Amino acid sequence: MGLVSGSVQFIRKDPDFTEKPYNINATLTAGSNDRLDGSLEAEFGGKYGYVRTNISHNEADDYKDGDGNRIHSNFKRDSQMLQLGVTPTENTTIAGTYERSRAKVAYADRMMDGSKFDRDAWNIRFTQRNLTPWFSELELRYGKSEIDHVMDTYSLRTIYNPAGKQIKNANNPKRNTDTGRLKATFDWDKLNLQTGLDYLDDVHVARNERGGDGYSHKPYMPNQSFKQWGIFTEASWQQTDNQRWVAGLRHDQVKAHYDTARVTDPVLKHQKFNLNSGFLRWERNTDNGLKYYAGFGIAERAPNYWERLRSENKAIRAEQNRQIDAGVIWKRPNLHASVSVFGSNIKDFIMMERQGMNFGVRNINASRFGGEAEVKWTFAPNWEVGTSLAYTHGKNRTDGKPLAQTPPLEWNNTLAFDNGKFSAGALWRVVAKQNRYSKGQGNIVGQDIGASSGFGVLSLNAGWKFSKYATLQGGVDNVFNKTYAEFVSRGGDPSAGTQTMRVNEPGRTAWLRLQAKF
């Protein structure tokens, strides 16, 4: 569910050419199972503009689990990004970005593989900073993207029916999205205010083939479409040097439409969701290195494409999550410790479940609570030891059962050495067995299959910074070649079909990485 009393945004910053007119970062990784990863990030520019590019390649063959069984898991992905920016003044940026990726992936836990994952996207951004002493920034973004997926039973595998004939089925969903965003930032003495609105126009079409491979000659058929408008505001008030309050509100209107002729009920065919979300967060720092925080939030979301696809003739209500969280962080020169806890009540949780040979969707009431504790100690120069513990408990209150796809107790232990030139590390990951499951229930990514066994996995790594610009790293994951599987499914694109089995993770794998920065 995530924390609703706060959020983190990952934003690609404008490049900084204060020290030099370029920045280059190149990485090459090779490993077991014919793994090969490579990436190049480069940016060049000056006072009035810049160009930035990112090129990456990732591929691997099927891996073997700890028992030596080959797991159908090969993949290949290539992606490129090009961004051009113009900075006519020190406070103005106009940037255009194009991103492209092509991929294919084999799924061991499903009856179909992703033989085509094509994505093309572009966006343009205008930013004006320091308009007035209190009007800090105005930002406008617009973007378009197209995603074209193909899932089939024959490109990356060969399967036969009882009569000995090859099974050839394919699904080809396609998605076109337009997005826009306007945001203004204001700063006063102790108050920061961000407010704006955003827009999403999302259109889905699809085509399929049963008993052949001729889907590409068929026309796309309308499937679903969504239109969403949102307005938001977030304020941060530095009440004192040691105390801060953060609050936010958001309202969204989502219009969801079935374009397929299979849905004839006008109440279901055209649905409108008015969604309200908000949070309040308190933070306090003390002079002895302690930081306290607590928050409360409410988040609502409408059913997404995949959930609506499984419930074409049934009204699904929006999901509402009410959550509280609190924690404490303690920082000393050689010690870092933190404890956090949360509790949430989810009304109309959108759950997928197996119904005979098919899957259905319904709303339930659910609850979750859990916490995490972590300690890191620098016990000697260049040496650090750490440990962390995390647990989540989920309950389906409607059925009186465990909430599906809830991970078990996990305990991580680390030991690291780094003197600036040489480094080494060890990670011992211990995961408890999970007996709290609800077979056949879950979400769009995966469903509970049954209980899972506990496991412990040790991984080692080392590094050598042999020059000012380059570092060589290597490691071995799952050193003792343990056979194990995660409880929560991680493999699922929902369009690849129904999860049918739990898949073992890789056995012992080795890797070597060369990284250079200029």
Language model features with spans:
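Periplasmic-side early beta-strands and strand-to-turn transitions of outer-membrane beta-barrels
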Residues: 8-11, 15-19, 25, 36, ...
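Transmembrane beta-strands of outer-membrane beta-barrel pores
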Residues: 28-32, 46-48, 57-61, 100-104, ...
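Membrane-embedded beta-barrel scaffold of Gram-negative outer-membrane proteins
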Residues: 49, 53, 136-155, 283-297, ...
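Flexible loop and strand-edge segments within Gram-negative outer membrane beta-barrel domains
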Residues: 60-61, 77, 91-138, 145-177, ...
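Signature of Gram-negative outer-membrane beta-barrel scaffolds
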Residues: 67, 71, 193-290, 302-303, ...
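Outer-membrane beta-barrel "beta-signal"
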Residues: 124-126, 281, 327-329, 334-336, ...
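Gram-negative outer-membrane beta-barrel transporters
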Residues: 238-246, 252-254, 341-345, 362-440, ...
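C-terminal beta-signal and adjacent terminal beta-strands/loops
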Residues: 345-347, 380, 430-439, 463-518
